[in-house]
Amino acid sequence: MEEEKLEIVGPLEEPLMGNIVPEEINGLDSLTSSDSDSEKPDSPVPINAPIYRMFGRERPIHMVLGGGKPADVLLWRDKKVTLGLLSAVTVIWLLFGFGGRRLLTSLCRGSILFLLLSFLWSNALNKSPENMMDIYIPEKPLLQAASAMTFELNCAFATLRSIALERDIKNFVMAVIGLWLVSVIGNWFSFLSLLYICFVLIHTVPMLYEKYEDEIDPIAEKAVIEMKKHYQVFEAKFLSKIPH
């Protein structure tokens, strides 16, 4: 009897286990598939969305300005040097711009004062010339400034030459309008005042832009879009009618 029971029970257990196990596996598969489906986002979200930066730059403003000491001065990282430069240039502008002083006259009078002080130092006070402070202009910064100015002037001349020779009426008209606007601005200020304004802007605008670039860039993007729209309208109405 026991053998018969074993023979009967044995075949019955296999289909029971076979029916139970696949259902459990199917249940687990459905759970995992539903979990994976729920974990999938509904729509792809860009991780690294492009951020508009003025002039299409991809580097920090400090690196755009060349880095090093000049960039530190322009961005007010070295406040003592920046304030010293602005103060000195402001004094020079006030003396020669509003004070009515002449550069040659001031240089000659300064040289006379230097000669008098040197004479008193060496003769009346019986001081040796070796104890006097040497005054000289360093050569390297002047050469760098002259080289940079020469490069910019050559680029400007090359640009004007290419505009004059490429026979593109649109570029020619735009260049003439730009130069005319600069000449109008030049009538409002003297050359020394223009240099002073440019110097102050160079030493203030980069610092303010670096400080508030997250607020300035969206406004600049909207302004660029509007300017492009107005330029397209201007080109369609006027520039497109100019023969090539």
UniProtKB/Swiss-Prot annotation:
Main location: endoplasmic reticulum
Subcellular localization: Endoplasmic reticulum membrane
Keyword hit for DNA damage: no
Domain of life assignment: Eukaryota
Keywords: Endoplasmic reticulum, Membrane, Transmembrane, Transmembrane helix
Alphabetized InterPro entries for the sequence: Reticulon, Reticulon-like
A Pfam family the protein falls into: Reticulon
A single cellular component GO annotation: endoplasmic reticulum membrane
Record GO biological process: response to bacterium
Residues annotated as transmembrane: 80-100, 103-123, 172-192
Record-annotated Reticulon domain positions: 70-244
Topological type in the membrane: Multi-pass membrane protein
Name of the protein in its database record: Reticulon-like protein B7
Organism encoding this protein: Arabidopsis thaliana
